[in-house]
């Protein structure tokens, strides 16, 4: 019998960060983040790592999510192969 997740346990989401265009490539591209965290935390992390204030961030090379979105919601709707793919660029890459 499988044990149910307790409400206090936090599900971790694997976020795969992929450089797009002229953006520098990170040494470590995969990270785990709590699903209850907002997407703004991913954006802030990238800004600190890249030392840039201006940054364009997309999910699955398709759209830029609202920073208030929960990471777990993005993963449940757009994640695949056990991870959420996040593309980042220093200039606008997709409309």
From Swiss-Prot:
Keywords: Autophagy, Cytoplasm, Isopeptide bond, Protein transport, Transport, Ubl conjugation pathway
GO biological process, one term: autophagosome assembly
SUPFAM superfamilies, per the entry: Ubiquitin-like
Main location: cytoplasm
Gene Ontology CC entries for this record: cytoplasm
Pfam families in the record: APG12
CDD domains the UniProt entry points to: Ubl_ATG12
Localisation: Cytoplasm
Cross-link (Glycyl lysine isopeptide (Gly-Lys) (interchain with K-? in ATG5)): 95
Domain of life: Eukaryota
Residues spanning the signal sequence: none
Function: Ubiquitin-like protein involved in cytoplasm to vacuole transport (Cvt) and autophagy vesicles formation. Conjugation with ATG5 through a ubiquitin-like conjugating system is essential for its function. ATG12/ATG5 conjugate has an essential role in plant nutrient recycling.
Family: Belongs to the ATG12 family.
Protein name: Ubiquitin-like protein ATG12
Organism of derivation: Medicago truncatula
């Amino acid at each position: 019998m499988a044990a149910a997740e307790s409400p206090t346990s936090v599900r971790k989401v694997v976020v795969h960060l992929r450089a797009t265009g002229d953006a520098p490539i990170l040494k470590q591209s995969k990270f785990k983040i709590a699903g209850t965290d907002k997407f703004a935390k991913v954006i802030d992390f990238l800004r600190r790592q890249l030392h840039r204030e201006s940054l364009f961030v997309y999910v699955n090379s398709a759209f830029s999510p609202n920073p208030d979105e929960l990471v777990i919601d993005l993963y449940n709707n757009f994640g695949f192969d056990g991870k959420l793919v996040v593309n980042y660029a220093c200039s606008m890459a997709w409309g």
